[in-house]
Amino acid sequence: MKIRIDHIAKIEGHGGFVGEIIKGDVVQARFMVNEGARLLEGILRDRHYEETSQIAARICGVCPVVHTLTSIKALEAAMGVEVGSETIFLRQLLMLGQLINSHALHLFFFSLADFFGIKDDLKLIKKYPAYTKDALAIREFGNMLVEKIGGRTIHPLAAEIGGFKKWPSKQILLKIKKEAEKVLPGAIRLGKLFAKLKYPDLQTNFNWASVTAL
């Protein structure tokens, strides 16, 4: 028996599944990435180098920061530009903002309902309103972090080759610190919740191509 699912819900992007069962044994189980061609290389050709980070950011509305910073760092490497510790720190904050936003969305709203056998996310929200508020507050903090450092939440503009177009003030950095302290207890509560979940005993061999290529 062959199984084919062309669209899997609750993932960031588009994916499918192909499986085959013969005499009760699973002989194939394969996840398919169904992302279409982006053709960014062709779009970037012959464009001014200062435009590349904003064009590359359009690869994704959920994770534009990583594409922005990757294109900037690639150009800095090509030009031999070295940045200072302040720039590195702010880029790390910017990247953390995206990760916090994305992970809060994915872990709570995409994954948690399945662990509790709840098919409807609205039922999850009604059953665990306090955890829902924690997840939303954490996600909002991630958005705020990207906005304050990057200039706006989606497709941030501030990062550029060599540094930032506009540097955050001391007041903004202190506000980020204050907001981080506010959401930390909720993050700990959610962490304890996920620590109690029963995870499947799954072991997979990985090639780690992107890591070994560094």
Residue ranges: model-predicted function:
Residues 1-214:
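Active-site bordering "gate/hinge" segments
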